[in-house]
Amino acid sequence: MVIAAPEPNTEVQPAIGEQRVVIHGVSWEAYLQILDALPQSRSSRLTYDDGVLEITMPLEDHEFSGRLIECFIRALVELMGLRIKTMGSTTINYPQLKKGAEPDNAYYIQNQPLVKGRNVDFAHDPPPDLVVEVDITHTDIQKNRFYATLKVPEFWRFNGKVWRIYQLQDGVYVEVEASPTFPQVPKERLYAFLEQAKEDEIEAVQSLRTWWQK
């Protein structure tokens, strides 16, 4: 029997990474109307979980971490000779589950050949292979359960200090020490990358390449 990893506690973080508005009792139809009414180019991100709508406005710490994690992933994909389709914060809607999300980043890596060169149809295509969420402040959405229901194989969460890696096993997320997508890369490399990138982002990428090529 696989036991799901507990939801990490994000309330203890002193930094303010996001502003959030939570609305309860929102129907799926109302959620879609709100999506349609909002401009395509916006900083806010929506997550809908069966009646609960959370609107997140990322602040600097959030965006900084999210962008650097994306640089980290793309560098690893290139170094390992993999392929990638980046979905960014594309709206991922599953009407049958009454769930929708705009994660910080989502990627097709293992399944990139299935979706390359076209728009993804979530009604027929598999979910992204890897989803990344930066949650520095408390979120009312149980993200682990949420993305496990969407059957996302791998889920990364970063709270501004701690990076957690979850792998889907028997329908629930289990916390693991190494990424199934990048098994050769220890957690320490991301922490070192983020710390170095605070001073210089290009140098952080160069250091990652040097480490890989040793």
Mark where each language-model region is:
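Gly/Pro/Ser/Thr-rich low-complexity, intrinsically disordered segments predominantly at protein N-termini
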Residues: 1-214
